[in-house]
From Swiss-Prot:
Keywords: Acetylation, Cytoplasm, Disease variant, Initiation factor, Leukodystrophy, Phosphoprotein, Protein biosynthesis. It is linked to Leukoencephalopathy with vanishing white matter 3: An autosomal recessive brain disease characterized by neurological features including progressive cerebellar ataxia, spasticity, and cognitive deficits. Brain imaging shows abnormal white matter that vanishes over time and is replaced by cerebrospinal fluid. Disease severity ranges from fatal infantile forms to adult forms without neurological deterioration. The disease is progressive with, in most individuals, additional episodes of rapid deterioration following febrile infections or minor head trauma. Acts as a component of the translation initiation factor 2B (eIF2B) complex, which catalyzes the exchange of GDP for GTP on the eukaryotic initiation factor 2 (eIF2) complex gamma subunit. Its guanine nucleotide exchange factor activity is repressed when bound to eIF2 complex phosphorylated on the alpha subunit, thereby limiting the amount of methionyl-initiator methionine tRNA available to the ribosome and consequently global translation is repressed. GO terms for biological process: cytoplasmic translational initiation; oligodendrocyte development; response to glucose; response to heat; response to peptide hormone; T cell receptor signaling pathway; translational initiation. This is Translation initiation factor eIF2B subunit gamma. The modification N-acetylmethionine is found at residue 1. It is found in: Cytoplasm, Cytosol. Component of the translation initiation factor 2B (eIF2B) complex which is a heterodecamer of two sets of five different subunits: alpha, beta, gamma, delta and epsilon. Subunits alpha, beta and delta comprise a regulatory subcomplex and subunits epsilon and gamma comprise a catalytic subcomplex. Within the complex, the hexameric regulatory complex resides at the center, with the two heterodimeric catalytic subcomplexes bound on opposite sides. InterPro entries: eIF2B_gamma, NTP_transferase_dom, Nucleotide-diphossugar_trans. SUPFAM superfamilies: Nucleotide-diphospho-sugar transferases. One of its GO terms (cellular component) is eukaryotic translation initiation factor 2B complex. Activated by the chemical integrated stress response (ISR) inhibitor ISRIB which stimulates guanine nucleotide exchange factor activity for both phosphorylated and unphosphorylated eIF2. The modification Phosphoserine is found at residue 260.
Amino acid sequence: MEFQAVVMAVGGGSRMTDLTSSIPKPLLPVGNKPLIWYPLNLLERVGFEEVIVVTTRDVQKALCAEFKMKMKPDIVCIPDDADMGTADSLRYIYPKLKTDVLVLSCDLITDVALHEVVDLFRAYDASLAMLMRKGQDSIEPVPGQKGKKKAVEQRDFIGVDSTGKRLLFMANEADLDEELVIKGSILQKHPRIRFHTGLVDAHLYCLKKYIVDFLMENGSITSIRSELIPYLVRKQFSSASSQQGQEEKEEDLKKKELKSLDIYSFIKEANTLNLAPYDACWNACRGDRWEDLSRSQVRCYVHIMKEGLCSRVSTLGLYMEANRQVPKLLSALCPEEPPVHSSAQIVSKHLVGVDSLIGPETQIGEKSSIKRSVIGSSCLIKDRVTITNCLLMNSVTVEEGSNIQGSVICNNAVIEKGADIKDCLIGSGQRIEAKAKRVNEVIVGNDQLMEI
């Protein structure tokens, strides 16, 4: 077994809490499948037979009851009161990890050819290989935003070599001063660096086993994304000998601590005697200067996905966008599953668009139009209803003559007769009164708050 696959399904979805307060984030419906189905399906498609899923007890119960895959999941539940980052989660399952690791987030939806990331990891004997995509701005409004401009998220500054594969620099603009400082040791080996500010981390990582060993002994690192990876990128161009020389100048106790926590001591234990493959050294000849990979002990690489679907469902806007895009993806992944479930009852079938999905046991009345929308299971949509560019979860009732556009309607909500709803988020169990007009509103329970 070359890799052990690990799916992280612990995060509570802090940026979409009005959705996740009643449904755990890994179980949020996307295209009428739980969100966690997508990374699990990706692994199964490329031949993984086992996967470790780190999650909560609520998600474990649902997976055990509904898991319909050939792949065998080893579900590990974190303590209910634990506040664990992704690095903490790897430490928690450390006794199970015997080989190099492939880590995925439960909110990743992608049709990437996974072998492109894995082949990069193999060819260059990398410490880390990760997946990134070019950022894509959705032109669709986000429900409940009330006309405000979308908050500008801080960018990552990503530096790569002339091949676009070697990851040379990585920092968030929040961590940078007014000037961008590049170490001389990097420029010596790579005088030409190409910087990107529009790339998004997909949270898919191949990691050497010694990286996990290092994490086990360094409890101060809690996050793979924000702490471990920037550390590894920086460590590529500092030698073990210079690190040791620096440590010798410190006090004895501090020197001993640094030595035990530094990545190079773990590389020595793992594979100091194993030089990088000849092919890797040869491949590194491309560009301005030849680099002897056998001397560069920490090596970080990135596969930048330029085409296809690659999205992380981390906000309401991205959740809506994922539901718009997955019908096309599912037609390729699950061609045996029709977009309209066989148990659904639809009076005016010609008014249901081919770009929509209809779940089991749903009833749609006469002259009701469904366009570019995902409708969950056991919904009741009565006569003369118009639903456009929406997501309706399970057991939603929409009464006669209602019009819903660009909205998310959560489980068990009721939209009464003649209501007009546009760009809204209606929480679980909420009721919208007859003939109401709602625009750009978030209507949820008092215990549900969200950052949009």
